[in-house]
């Protein structure tokens, strides 16, 4: 007695069309994921910049040297930006970048005045403002990385 068994590889496999469709979907989602990552990065940059400015303003050395009107103007702009962030969690990357440029437009001239008035000194090499435009105003000039303060 003989039994004939035929084994085929087609059972339970995806067809060529299904594989192509899945690859196309993966590509589509890849672009969406990259766009979402860029949006989140822009949001984090704005948030970080606003809170960095707020911390810089709360420093007593900065507080002593800043003009009261400038400090009030900058504090109001920071508060406005933080409120905007809270109200616009799903904003686009461009909206976050636009808000950051707006905040920098107010903050940079004020911080330039502060550093120019002999605040904590600029970067070596005569770069007023202690850094590159668009960079966060560091508490300690010449520092390469972010300043981390541990609070109990």
Swiss-Prot record:
Q: List the disulfide bonds.
A: none
Name the Gene Ontology molecular function terms of this record: ATP binding; ATP-dependent protein folding chaperone
Query: What spans are recorded as compositionally biased (Gly residues)?
Result: 121-142
Keyword line: Allergen, ATP-binding, Chaperone, Nucleotide-binding, Stress response
Q: Which GO terms describe its cellular component?
A: endoplasmic reticulum chaperone complex
Q: Name one GO biological process term.
A: endoplasmic reticulum unfolded protein response
Region: Disordered; residue ranges are 121-152
Q: Which family does it belong to?
A: Belongs to the heat shock protein 70 family.
Its protein name is: Heat shock 70 kDa protein
